[in-house]
Amino acid sequence: YNNYFTATASTLTASGVDTGFNINSLKNWQAFDYVQFASGTNYAQIDCGSAVNIDFLAICAHELFTKNCTAITIKGSSDVAFGTSTTLATLTRDSAGTPPVYSGSYKLNTSTSLASQVVNDDPHICFKLDTATFRYYRLTFTCASAVKIGVMAIGLKMEFERGFYGGFMPQTWNEEITTTVNKSIGGIYLGTSIERSGTKTETINLEDLTHSWIESTWLPFRRHAVLYPFIFSWGNTPLSNNSLAIQKTFTNGKVKNRSYGSVGLTFEGTIK
């Protein structure tokens, strides 16, 4: 939820933004308020005002995969012109098509490879990274047609103090799609229309948390999530199980003893 794209001190610049669109559409969490880039090689760049630490980056509500974009790269730099830079993540199109095939790498544990995989639709992207410290960060990509991006986020991720595994519902396994079956007057099947897609409502209950973690880490997130969306990413799969999520309710925080307590939330969202 820590997102420098929405920070007041940050300034956004870009190349190739189509007429009628504005790069500052990326300065909020609203997926419907998108920026559209023209065909060609383009970039979106953030100036954080000073060097900042980040250990995640996310791109949501985009068309990078269905538009078969190539050379998708995220870099950090201390130079506004990116004369020198460090590559934080790359996505390479191995095969064009519907769906296309992508592979890549990203700077986690120094370097982690992303195996070549078929990418259906436009899943939200979330890379977990080793901590990087730069003032400027830039997304670059090449596309043969216009492409939209709705949300970008970089910052420091919040990791849970305790893991949870049994009974958890991974987002990609539980996509919820509302459809309407269309029939003729005579009852002949004409097709199925998708009305809405998203993920099933998920509840996370976190037990045996230290009071200090709740106070220092959970409560700042809670204050953010009361009003704004957040990225929920489960596991280490940059192209799946990443949600642009909103909270529905918070579980009552409870004291277990003088050292430990429990918190939780119920949320829903989208995965593409």
Predicted feature descriptions by range:
Residues 1-42, 52, 58-69, 78-134, ...:
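Extracellular/virion structural assembly segments
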Residues 48-50:
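A short glycine/threonine-centered beta-strand motif
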Residues 74-76:
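Conserved aromatic beta-strand anchor motif in extracellular beta-sandwich/beta-rich domains
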